[in-house]
Amino acid sequence: MHIRFTKMHGLGNDFVVIDATRTPVDLTPARVKAIADRHFGVGCDQLLVVEPPGSDEVDFRYRIFNADGGEVEQCGNGARCFVRFVHDKGLTDKREIRVETRAGVIAPALRPDGLVSVDMGVPELSPARIPFVSDSDAWVQPLQLAEDTVAITAVSMGNPHAVQVVADVDTAPVARQGAEIECHPRFPARVNAGFMQVVDAGHIRLRVFERGAGETLACGTGACAAVVAGIGRGLLVSPVRVETRGGELEIAWAGPGTPVVMTGPAVTVFEGELELP
């Protein structure tokens, strides 16, 4: 089966995007892994699928698959690429759309300056709903690792995140601790591990070890979770400039019970055709 695809990225977090609005695409975990393979496939951090809406209240359905073949709830950088894709492909003439995800409805908007703003929804802070095994709802909680005990803040942006503050992201043990935190038993659905360096109250540097993908150049939901964690701990004031290895995002959050708004770029790299294995 031959399908058309578009390669896109948001701050170096790269995606293969497939239009399934007219013809369904059968994406097994093996097929996703084959497409995402950087040596034998197209190569990407995540595969994004555009599907018809499931109700009249939304414009599209948005599905996200990690490079390991697993389907996940949310991807912030992907959401920006999603709205750029459907607009550029003529699938909608709306500059702001409502999109159904496994985590709920999001509302990305294409701005006149070419950047994309996404209402990422209200962050979930209740441990049971993240999910995070804890009998406390404290903002900062200890997490025991094999060689360290780290202080983390658990946040869900539709997908789970564990954010810790580090002195310097360049020297932080992202690979070692990230892999251990991702599969920590206190996170039964696994977790994205964020390493945040606070430069000042309006600026952070961030690295994220993503669940099912490893460290990426940028993580949109990770940036949102880091800013929520930093504001909750009294370290940051909205809006916050988030510096990643792939570029910068702006994250705004007014506090508990309000949505997080993420703004950043979305870039088309190339288009092609592939044969599904």
UniProtKB/Swiss-Prot annotation:
The record marks H161, E210 as: Could be important to modulate the pK values of the two catalytic cysteine residues. Substrate binds at N13, Q46, N66, G76, N77, N159, N192, E210, R211, G220, T221. It comes from the Bacteria. It is found in: Cytoplasm. GO terms for molecular function: diaminopimelate epimerase activity. InterPro entries: DAP_epimerase_AS (IPR018510), DAP_epimerase_DapF (IPR001653). Its EC number is 5.1.1.7. It holds the Pfam family DAP_epimerase. The active site is at C75 (proton donor), C219 (proton acceptor). GO terms for cellular component: cytosol. The keyword Amino-acid biosynthesis applies. The keyword Isomerase applies. HAMAP family: DAP_epimerase. This is Diaminopimelate epimerase. It comes from Azoarcus sp. (strain BH72). The lineage of its organism: Bacteria, Pseudomonadati, Pseudomonadota, Betaproteobacteria, Rhodocyclales. The gene is dapF.
